């Protein structure tokens, strides 16, 4: 009887969760107002083959209402600017996968800044955070409404996400002092091992002489 009550309660909870989830319309990236914002990025270092250093280099980012405008501009309350993975850095990495359902999309996990909407040109200079992984990136700005839902966006690259990309090298986490300490420890271990064997041989000879 107790088991039946538990099963019934579990089914009731599951159905309740499903009904709550179904009550909210699934929000899709393709339904956002595309190109509503003009977004540009200027890395602190540029040129062929240049790779930016996490924790050191900076991005100068600008955004403004695009020339084509947006029919949903009245809904814009906050602009959220994010660092996003470009396709080359998403290959074989499902945790970075692009998904049309915004709730499931993992393209832009790195928050840069959030500011109240202003149609005039806005800018920020952002230092690449120390925990940014090695990869190829672009910047996207979302226009968010009063209830926190994305309604429009603009990005620093084209629709195919192939232009105006930049590369970042992550901090390795290793320091010269650690490498020196590691070498010293290895040398000490070898010396200690040699001394140990020499002492053991000496003890063995003394025992034999007795």
UniProtKB/Swiss-Prot annotation:
Protein name: High-affinity nitrate transporter 3.1
Function: Acts as a dual component transporter with NTR2.1. Required for high-affinity nitrate transport. Acts as a repressor of lateral root initiation. May be involved in targeting NRT2 proteins to the plasma membrane.
Transmembrane segments: 178-198
Molecular function (Gene Ontology), one example: nitrate transmembrane transporter activity
Organism placement in taxonomy: Eukaryota, Viridiplantae, Streptophyta, Embryophyta, Tracheophyta
GO process annotations (BP): nitrate assimilation; nitrate transmembrane transport; response to nitrate; response to wounding
Consequence of substituting residue 105 to N: In rnc1; decreased nitrate uptake and accumulation
UniProt cross-references to PANTHER family, sorted A to Z: HIGH-AFFINITY NITRATE TRANSPORTER 3.1, HIGH-AFFINITY NITRATE TRANSPORTER 3.2
Tissue: Highly expressed in roots. Detected in shoots.
